[in-house]
Amino acid sequence: MQDDERKETWDEFRGLVNMSPAELEKWLASEESQSAGQHKDGGESTGHASGRRILDILRTNKGDLSDDDYQHMRKVVGYIRRHVAQRPSGDVRDTRWRHSLMNWGHDPLD
């Protein structure tokens, strides 16, 4: 990945991932987090696994991020954009929609 692509990816990722590492870590430990999203074979949901990966990325020095990290960041940006566009009507405070986005590091209420 070229430097300009990395910069664009970083900027988009940091613009959409609006939860701090501490907030995301606390959220991922919650029952609401673990029950949100699509679970494969009764295991961890895709979003929850992504949240753990996002936490690792946020805690890594920017210069130490790999191309694989940047690819995951692109995936996160795409997911958040798609799901924000599908916001349900009404109060979303305790919805699976919000909980799923929070697993991906984005709290739509912030």
What kind of region is each of these model predictions?
Residues Q2-D110:
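A charge-rich, low-complexity, intrinsically flexible signal that marks solvent-exposed coils, linkers
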